Amino acid sequence: MSDQNEVLFEIKREHLNTGLRGFPVGTCRTSSVDPLEGLHYVGYPIADLADLDPEAAAYLLLYKALPDADQLAAFKAELIKRSAVNPVVINTLKALPKEGHPMEWLIAGLNLLGMTSKTGSFEEDGLNVIARMPEVVAAIYRIRSGWGEPIASKPEL
C-alpha cells in the first residue's frame, strides 16, 4: 500500500506559466486523455463507444462498465419511470427571453430540473437528469423555434 503523503513531483512557479503541462493535477476513473491515444471513457477509446445506444453510454459513465442486454433493458426501463418533467420546468422555459443563447436555455433547464426534483442523492439526481433531459431539450427547441406548445415526450419510443 502506498503512503498517501508521499511526494510524487514538485511544481515550481515556472510550471504555472505552461498550464501545468505534463503534471497530473487530478485523477478520474471515468475519463482520461492521452496525447497519442486520445480520449478514453472508463478505459474504452471514445471511437469504440460512438455507436452505443445513448443509454449504454450513460450506464458506462455511471457504473464504470458496459451493460449486458438485461442490464441495458432494466436501465432503459428505469429511465422511462423517471422521465416525467415537472410542469414548472416547461412553464418557466416558456417565460424565458427568446433572444437567449441555446446554451443559456440549456443551463436554465438543468437548473430548473435541479430545483424541482432534488432528492439529496447524487446518483438519484443524476438518473433523474439523464431521464428528463430529452424532454427539456425538445421543449427548448420547440419554444425557441416558435413551434407552439412543447409536446410531452414518449420515452418508451
Question: Model-derived features: where do they sit?
Answer:
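Hydrophobic alpha-helical bundle cores within soluble ligand-binding/oligomerization subdomains
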Residues: 1-157
